[in-house]
Structures are given as structure tokens and as C-alpha cells.
Amino acid sequence: KVFGGGMRQAGFLAAAGIYALDHQVERLKEDHARAKALGEMLGKLHQVSEIFPVATNIVIARLEGTTPEEFMKKLSDQNIKSVKFGKDLVRFVTHLDFDDDQLEEFGKRIEKI
């Protein structure tokens, strides 16, 4: 492994990357559009003071009047996953398996927090 013996798995990783470039790049626009919509929904919450500009499939929300831990607990109670991203930030990510129906459901669930 010291001399590259652990690199034999690199071919599997490279194959996944090649597949993604060949088959997924065009549909990334869908993830980005859903992320933008998700950010707009989050921006309506009183706990969210700012949504960073959404240019990809990542949404970052700045919180006010609550901690990321408290906010994430409320999200978790609605089966919504997020990640703490700083002292007052929470991050969300859309992906291939997050579709329009789930986006709509997300909107309904965050109204409950």
C-alpha cells in the first residue's frame, strides 16, 4: 500500500465518474432547479434569516433565533435530513433520487416546524 497497492480500487471509482459524465450531467439541471425551489421554501420559515445563492444542488440556510441542532431536530421529526454547516448554518442537498413529489412533500413538512 505504501507504493500504491491500495490504488487497485481506483478503477471502480473512475468507472463511476465516467458513467456520471456520460449519463448524468444533463439531468443535473433538474437537481439544481429543485434545490432552488427548496431554498425558496426554506426562506419563508421564520427560523431562516438568509438563503445563500443557490447555483448547484446545495442549499445553505442561515438560522436566526434557533441553533442548528434545534432546527435539525425539528426537521428530523419530519423525516428531513440536513447537516450542520457552521455555528448558524444548515446545509441541504438535492440528488438523483429527490424528485418533484418529494419536493412537494418537503414543502408540506416544513410548514409543520
Residue ranges and their predicted role:
Residues 1-20:
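PLP-dependent aminotransferase class I/II
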Residues 19-39:
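Structural signature of PLP-dependent enzymes
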Residues 66, 88-113:
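PLP-dependent enzyme catalytic core of the Aspartate aminotransferase-like
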Residues 48-75, 94-96:
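Conserved PLP-binding catalytic core of the aspartate aminotransferase-like
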Residues 53, 79-94:
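Conserved PLP cofactor-binding pocket of PLP-dependent enzymes
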Residues 41-47, 74-80:
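Short amphipathic beta-strand starts and helix->beta connectors
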Residues 6-11, 45-54, 85-86:
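Flexible, glycine/charged-enriched surface loops at secondary-structure junctions
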Residues 71-78, 105-111:
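Short amphipathic alpha-helices in soluble, non-transmembrane regions
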